[in-house]
């Protein structure tokens, strides 16, 4: 009887201790509903700046989340933001339907949008939706399914591609393009 009581006490002690401990390798998950961030139901792209602030391309615009507060930054056209990329200079580049540019903080620490679309001289937009943004060879690259746009910090050059880029992937300093009905290509200067 004493042994049974001792075993029962030991078992009870260990089981109560194990309930209070966390499960190893179990990620902490926090869900955010549409009512938390007060924007569209679809999120298309996510990136994070060097301060830890998250930027999310959303149906209603660019969402900014500092870990506590959400803020929506709409494009002048109020279009969906499909792609988001943060440049080395801290600019937040965004892509949308026949629109692309960047948000930059002003002297009041508010985000202000600067369109780059009209900087693409001699380029006619035709259903160009910017799906991916990355950097290559010192330029920001905006990718739609029929065009690539290169921004060097001053000018924008738009080109129609012979093969249609489905997506861009960056590995180190090399940018790869998966082509629609094609193979994998390397974006060269």
Write out the residue ranges for each language-model feature:
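Carboxylate-rich, polar loop motifs that coordinate divalent cations or form catalytic acidic clusters
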Residues: 1-189
